[in-house]
């Protein structure tokens, strides 16, 4: 196993521990807590894949970080901060919406690009709105935390979420996953509308009618993919 992979995991574990302490002391906001829960799942998945104990890795990570801080100067820190662009966090969903349990009568799911797409194929003739929480860098979606599909009465009927044990995903991965989800829901005559944030940061355009900015050709292609999988 590559030593850099182990070191990276150990440091990530310790930094997660520090962030958890902040959360326990009520020193962080809702987006911070969102990322904390997501990263906890990711660390558990990585630990299982690498065969490493999280507690031991956290202690080793602490030693590595402490050694680095001993040689770190304020000037180096200022330079690092100035040269690194800071991502923004976009929230369509509240904490309640993103953490609510939901169930499917006719479950269908697909893995694509490190993302899990889930949808209830029993849903028909509904108006559905897509909402998502994600980070943005350089005015483009960087990392998806969660995307969920809601009916007008607030019921959750579909979801896209990162798979903790798999490597990260790209903007194209997210767009493809959304296309699969839309195709599957529209196959049952549902009407889909994406939030303005999804339209702006995933595709960089806005549809005047509030619909998902997918060309008809791409919608039909995604629908055929879902039909073949179902």
Swiss-Prot record:
RNA-binding and homodimerization: annotated segments: 1-73
Organism: Influenza A virus (strain A/Duck/Alberta/60/1976 H12N5)
Annotated motif Nuclear export signal, positions: 137-146
Recorded superkingdom: Viruses
One example GO MF annotation: RNA binding
UniProt motif (Nuclear localization signal) ranges: 34-38
InterPro entries membership: NS1, NS1A, NS1A_effect_dom-like_sf, uS15_NS1_RNA-bd_sf
GO annotation, cellular component aspect: host cell cytoplasm; host cell nucleus
Job of this protein: Inhibits post-transcriptional processing of cellular pre-mRNA, by binding and inhibiting two cellular proteins that are required for the 3'-end processing of cellular pre-mRNAs: the 30 kDa cleavage and polyadenylation specificity factor/CPSF4 and the poly(A)-binding protein 2/PABPN1. In turn, unprocessed 3' end pre-mRNAs accumulate in the host nucleus and are no longer exported to the cytoplasm. Cellular protein synthesis is thereby shut off very early after virus infection.
PTM (free text): Upon interferon induction, ISGylated via host HERC5; this results in the impairment of NS1 interaction with RNA targets due to its inability to form homodimers and to interact with host EIF2AK2/PKR.
Segments of this protein annotated with the region Disordered: 209-230
Annotated signal peptide: none
One of the Pfam families matching this protein, by short name: Flu_NS1
Quaternary structure and partners: Homodimer. Interacts with host TRIM25 (via coiled coil); this interaction specifically inhibits TRIM25 multimerization and TRIM25-mediated RIGI CARD ubiquitination. Interacts with human EIF2AK2/PKR, CPSF4, IVNS1ABP and PABPN1.
GO BP terms in the entry: symbiont-mediated suppression of host cytoplasmic pattern recognition receptor signaling pathway via inhibition of RIG-I activity; symbiont-mediated suppression of host gene expression; symbiont-mediated suppression of host mRNA processing; symbiont-mediated suppression of host PKR/eIFalpha signaling; symbiont-mediated suppression of host type I interferon-mediated signaling pathway
Subcellular localization: Host nucleus; Host cytoplasm
Region span, CPSF4-binding: 180-215
Region (PABPN1-binding): 223-230
Protein family (similarity comment): Belongs to the influenza A viruses NS1 family.
The protein's name in its UniProt record: Non-structural protein 1
